[in-house]
Structures are given as C-alpha cells and as structure tokens.
A protein has these predicted regions:
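Conserved acetyl-CoA-binding loop-helix of GNAT-fold acetyltransferases
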Residues: 101-116, 134-142
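Conserved beta-strand-loop-alpha-helix junction that forms the acyl-donor binding cleft
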Residues: 127-137, 153-163
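A short, well-structured alpha-helix characteristic of acyl/acetyltransferase catalytic modules
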Residues: 1-42, 46, 183-206
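Conserved GNAT acetyl-CoA-binding A-motif
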Residues: 118-128
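Acetyl-CoA-dependent GNAT
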Residues: 41-100, 183-184, 191-197, 201-206
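Conserved acetyl-CoA-binding loop of GNAT-fold acetyltransferases
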Residues: 141-151
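Long, contiguous binding/interaction regions
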Residues: 112, 119, 159, 187, ...
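Mixed-charge, low-complexity intrinsically disordered segments
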Residues: 155-179
Length: 206
C-alpha cells in the first residue's frame, strides 16, 4: 500500500517514523483521569521497536502521523480493518493533550476523508467513539458522520478508576455498566459513505 503525505492549511499527514514514539513520550499528559490510558510512561528500546513494527507491517492498517507547520507531532491517524473487496474500513484519531480543541482534528479528518474517497476509492468509513466523549462526537458530526448503532466495550484494563464508587464520576455512570468482573463503556458507532460526503462536503468540516 502506498503511504501518502497529505498537506493541509495548518497540518501535514505523513508516514509514521520510528522517532515519533519519542516525540509522543514528550507530550504533556492528559489530566482527566478518564483519559490517563492515553498517557505513556517510559518504554524500552524493544517496546519502541515493537510499537513501530506493529503499526507499519500490518497490511490491513494505515498508520499516519500528523504534524503542524512547525514540524511538531500533533497526533496520529489510523485506518484499520481495511477491506479492499467491500471498499470499507474503520479509522481512529488521537491527538496529544496540548493540541486538542484547536481544530487540528477536524482538519485532519477532512483531509483523510478526501483522500479515502477520492484516491483510495473506498465507499464507507466507520468509527467507534466513547459515548461520553462529546467533544469528539461533535467533531465527527461536523465532518459528516452519522450514528449507526451502539455497542459496549471493555473499559481499559489499565484503568484503576472506581467508576461506580467515586463520586467524581456520578454524572457519567450512565455510560458504563458492570458485567461480572468487567466494566463496560458505551461506544457510539458512526459512519460516512462516499455518497453522503459528495452530497454535503461543501458544508462539512468548516
């Protein structure tokens, strides 16, 4: 698969470099305890090598880095579960904490969607987002994604948060449920098709 370099107004989406893991490790941590699983501690050389290899050798995955015009690493885009026969895939995006709420994610998604439909010639793009992540959901809706369903996934096993006992989380407990020893979190499934994008692309991601 050809790995693209895509330029926008404020960002460049490019192939992943092995040095990107060290850049990521220098990001400021997410202060919200619900997102602390995004924060990475120190990694050994072997762990860094595996991180890079896992993301660059999988034929069903296209893992890309996002830079700003100053060359700072802002985050990553990932197209995965690539199904060439049915012309569909899923995607995810992750930004460093200090680069959120600045419009970078919206611009990156806009660029990705254009490349995905016009250059890759795919027809459907899917994503899953935690239902409590209202900021991300709003961004995806701006970019033309629509709800298609709801599912529950295991809460990150690295988390030691007491969702049902800690009063800090009383307002978001509705997004979680307990099944045996597992805590599950609600995810919204969303998608955009090429037809949806062509119909409304002039009004999206502004």
């Amino acid at each position: 698969m050809v790995i693209p370099t895509l330029k926008g107004i404020r960002i460049t989406i490019r192939p992943l470099h092995q040095a990107d893991i060290d850049k990521r490790l220098r990001w400021k941590p997410y202060p919200n305890p619900l997102y602390k699983h995004y924060n990475r501690g120190e990694m050994s050389v072997e762990e860094k090598d595996k991180w890079y290899e896992d993301r660059t050798t999988n034929p069903n995955m296209l893992y890309l880095a996002i830079d700003n015009n100053q060359g700072e690493l802002l985050g990553f885009l990932n197209i995965f579960d690539i199904d060439p026969e049915n012309r569909k895939a899923s995607f995810g995006i992750y930004l460093g904490y200090e680069y959120t709420n600045k419009g970078y994610g919206t611009e990156a998604i806009n660029i990705l969607i254009h490349y995905y439909f016009e250059k890759m010639k795919f027809r459907e793009l899917y994503l899953g987002v935690a239902a409590l992540n209202h900021r991300a959901i709003h961004c995806y809706q701006k970019c033309g994604f629509e709800y298609v369903g709801t599912t529950y996934n295991k809460h990150d096993p690295r988390s030691d948060l007491d969702i049902f006992g800690d009063e800090r989380f009383i307002d978001i407990r509705k997004y979680f449920k307990q099944e045996g020893d597992n805590i599950l979190v609600r995810f919204e499934e969303m998608k955009i098709t090429k037809e949806m994008w062509l119909t409304s692309k002039d009004n999206l991601c502004e």
